[in-house]
Amino acid sequence: MKILISDPLAKEGIERLKKERGLEVTEAINLEEKELIETIAQYHALIVRSETKVTKEVIDVASHLRVIARAGTGLDNIDVEAATKRGIIVMNAPEGNTISAAEHTISMMLALSRNIPQAYLSLKEKRWDRKRFMGTEVYGKILGIVGLGRIGSEVAKRAQGLEMRVIAYDPFVSSEKAEERGITLFELEELLPQVDYLTVHTPLTSHTKGMIGEREIGLMKKGARIINCARGGIIEEDALYKALKQGKIAGAALDVFEKGKPFDSPLLELDSIVFTPHLGASTEEAQKRVAIVIASQVMDALKGGEVRNVVSLSTLSSFEKISP
């Protein structure tokens, strides 16, 4: 069976696939959609990260495709509905980058609090602006987490280690479960006025797109700070820009954007924002981990073994073993 890898994957995962008897592995990085459409018909599995767009047009001509595997978490670059209708399994590897994403969130929060990127650039320009970059402690502050899944929970643990008070909104987590972690749950409208820092950790879906907009930001206290290391589009950038310009929000830290590369975004003009180019999962450990995990999952799925981390459950009627 043939496997196409269309985004960079750590060598440990590729080597594992190539060692498996009966599998033919092709690496073709940075394919245009037209090129992917022209070549996909011959493959039984497609492994991607976030760059490759697996559109309905690609899926419609993928006559032999059985598995689409996302080496990572987010699925907004894959038309899961179209794949499901075609009976193609869509899977991801959500646990592989959990720690890296949580650590990056905390790093962004601290950099935002102490104006580290701005102070760095100032010093590079041979200026000594200590007063200009007066920061704020996170100790004793309230962190609001929207989405208390794997990453949100790890962020909570680290924030508690910094002696922050952590509260959260997640309709899928029970109050009892949250309280076991020392976290109090609130409805979103109740949470927002309380927080000094707000961080979002949800997938991008029709329900979460724009969930932090002008109305929600308006509920927050003056001087609060916002962090998004999850998915672009969860926070409305126009509303965030307006709130930052007006001084309603003191600052923001963004690792993701509504458009993949926000070079024409007015947000880049603001000094009150810390930016990184989607680095949440960009650690050696996370890349190796997700590559190994997704390689194992693809091999098992193609060979009729245990099928893990599937997001298109209606495609699994012919499989006996399913693992979450």
Language-model-detected regions and their locations in the chain:
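An N-terminal-biased, well-structured beta-alpha scaffold segment characteristic
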Residues: 1-91, 191-193, 213-219, 236
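N-terminal Rossmann-fold cofactor-binding loop
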Residues: 7, 29-30, 170-172, 230
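Short, conserved active-site loop motifs that form the nucleotide-linked donor/cofactor pocket
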Residues: 23, 88, 183, 272-274
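Short, Asp-centered acidic motifs that coordinate Mg2+ and/or phosphate
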Residues: 44-45, 67, 197, 225, ...
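Short glycine-/small-residue-rich Rossmann-like dinucleotide-binding loops
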Residues: 51, 73, 196, 202-204, ...
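Phosphate-binding beta-alpha-beta segment of Rossmann-like dinucleotide-binding domains, i.e.
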Residues: 86, 93-142, 150, 154-157, ...
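Rossmann-like dinucleotide-binding domain for NAD(H)/NADP(H)
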Residues: 90, 214, 222-324
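Rossmann-like dinucleotide/phosphate-binding beta-alpha-beta segment
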Residues: 131-222
